[in-house]
Amino acid sequence: ARFYAPLAVGNHVDHQLARAAAIALAEEGVPVTFYEDFPYAASADALVRALANPAPGGWRARRIALTSEELERKKQAIACYVSQNPVIFRHGPGMDEQVVEYALRVGEGRPAERLWDLVIGEATPALRSPSVS
C-alpha cells in the first residue's frame, strides 16, 4: 500500500500535520507519495521552499498525464470547495483557467499532475525555479 499526503506548499496547519505524519510513516518503511497543493504549488518559489523543508530522504518527481476527462474531474472537485474558492481565486484568472494553465505547465505542454515520492536514504538534487524539474 502507498500513502498519499499533501506536500504542504500552502503552509496550512492541517496539511503540515498530514505531511509530518506521512514523513513518520516513510521513516517506518511505508511508501509515501506527496501531491502538490494547488493553487499554492503554482508558485515555483513556494514549491521549492516546500521541497527544501527538511525530510529524511530525497524527493523524486514523477508526472502523471491527465486526460481531458480527468482534468475536468479535477476542476469539478476543486469547485466543491465553495467556501474557499471565492477567496483563493478572487484575483487574476478564474479557477478553471488556473487549473488548466498549471496542468499544462507541469506536463510541459500536456496536462499532467506532478507527484513527489519521498525516498529514504537518497539526497535530492538541487532544485531550481521556475520549472522545478
Predicted regions, residues:
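Surface-exposed cleft-lining segments at the edges of enzyme active sites
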Residues: 5-11, 61
